[in-house]
Amino acid sequence: MNNNATHNAPNLRTLAEGVLQPLGYEVLDVQVQNPGRRPIVVIRMDRLDEQPVTVEDLETASRAVGAEFDRVDPIAGEYRLELESPGAKRPLTRARHYERMLGLKARVRGDGHSFTAPIKAVDGEQVTFDVGGEDVTLTVGTFQGNLAEFPDRHR
């Protein structure tokens, strides 16, 4: 294994995106868990066509990312690679993610804010939340957002 490798999630994300985007997938989040021992690289992904992620999608993505990580060798020593669908705590990282989840509650942290509130509107990169009857508008990329409730249907 590569002795100069790093557990740098942004570098791993870049590698994963380069492999998954041409296959029709979007990387939502990359985390390196248990970095002091045998690291676990967790990649949360979605389909670019916004259809539900299937087991077959996860298998395809896992094989493709695994092959690229084997080729590039970005992590020193042994590690475990896990790919998963967004799930109930879906990361919201782009304006279109908020648009897709309009009306649902999001958990927001950063930019001096910490709240859970419904997504009220999206205008370009501006997302407006209904926080206790008051509008709070934030710019995508200046805060972290996750879906705080599971939609009753696929969006």
From Swiss-Prot:
BP terms from Gene Ontology: ribosomal small subunit assembly; translation
Keyword Cytoplasm (UniProt): yes
Record-linked Pfam families: DUF150_C (PF17384), RimP_N (PF02576)
One Gene Ontology cellular component: cytosol
TM regions (residue ranges): none
Xref: NCBIfam families: PRK14645.1
Annotated function: Required for maturation of 30S ribosomal subunits.
Protein's name according to its UniProt entry: Ribosome maturation factor RimP
The organism of origin for this protein: Deinococcus geothermalis (strain DSM 11300 / CIP 105573 / AG-3a)
Name of encoding gene: rimP
